[in-house]
């Protein structure tokens, strides 16, 4: 088992649903975890598919909650958005953009391939300073409440297994292969350096 706790980041597009559900579950299990989005703005479903609610990453979850409560309490209660924002504001004040974070992680989990590509591109564009490896793993999770919950438990199980490896660098590929077979999902994996 590693001598220090695994430093984990979970990343989706808007730091609202998938990454926050995983953040919630991982932090309850005692992991050192942060969550992020990679988008230029935070997008939440609106009254129609072509009318999302768009916010800046500086907007707090509380401000978003109150804005949607004012706009249409019934709609945003019924579709679960207010419940999700209520959970989010109990975890941290506002969404965060991955590209603005300078913290180092051992493991970064992304929730869709486009986000994985953005994270890898960002890490590769940074100046390498410590040559410390960071494993970036993509677990495809559909962006709805049910899939976010299932995906978060899968991410948690994966983190627990990685936390208990003797040698993460040499065991992670085999571990991911086992998880692929067990879950029926394909994982993307690469190593970047800080």
UniProtKB/Swiss-Prot annotation:
Superkingdom per UniProt: Eukaryota
Molecular function GO terms recorded: RNA polymerase II CTD heptapeptide repeat phosphatase activity
EC code(s) of this entry: 3.1.3.16
Recorded coiled-coil stretches: 160-187
GO terms, biological process: co-transcriptional mRNA 3'-end processing, cleavage and polyadenylation pathway
Catalytic reactions of this protein: O-phospho-L-seryl-[protein] + H2O = L-seryl-[protein] + phosphate; O-phospho-L-threonyl-[protein] + H2O = L-threonyl-[protein] + phosphate
Keyword Flavoprotein: no
Entries under InterPro entries matching the protein: RNA_pol_II_suA
Family listed: Belongs to the SSU72 phosphatase family.
Assembly and oligomerization: Interacts with GTF2B (via C-terminus); this interaction is inhibited by SYMPK. Interacts with RB1. Interacts with CD226. Interacts with SYMPK.
Record-given protein name: RNA polymerase II subunit A C-terminal domain phosphatase SSU72
């Amino acid at each position: 088992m590693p001598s220090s706790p695994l430093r984990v980041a979970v990343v989706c597009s808007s730091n609202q649903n998938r990454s926050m559900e995983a953040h919630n579950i991982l932090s309850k299990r005692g992991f050192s975890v942060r969550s992020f989005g990679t988008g230029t703005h935070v997008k939440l479903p609106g009254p129609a598919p072509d009318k999302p609610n768009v916010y800046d990453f500086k907007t707090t979850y509380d401000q978003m909650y109150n804005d949607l409560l004012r706009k249409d309490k019934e709609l945003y209660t019924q579709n679960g958005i207010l419940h999700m924002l209520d959970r989010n504001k109990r975890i941290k004040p506002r969404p965060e953009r991955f590209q603005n974070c300078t913290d180092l992680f051992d493991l970064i989990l992304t929730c869709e391939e486009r986000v994985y590509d953005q994270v890898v591109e960002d890490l590769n564009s940074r100046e390498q300073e410590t040559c410390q490896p960071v494993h970036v793993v993509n677990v495809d999770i559909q962006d709805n409440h049910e899939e976010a919950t299932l995906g978060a438990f899968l991410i948690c199980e994966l983190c627990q297994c990685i936390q208990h490896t003797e040698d993460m660098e040499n065991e992670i590929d085999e571990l991911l292969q086992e998880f692929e077979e067990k879950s029926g999902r394909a994982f993307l994996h690469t190593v970047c350096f800080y």
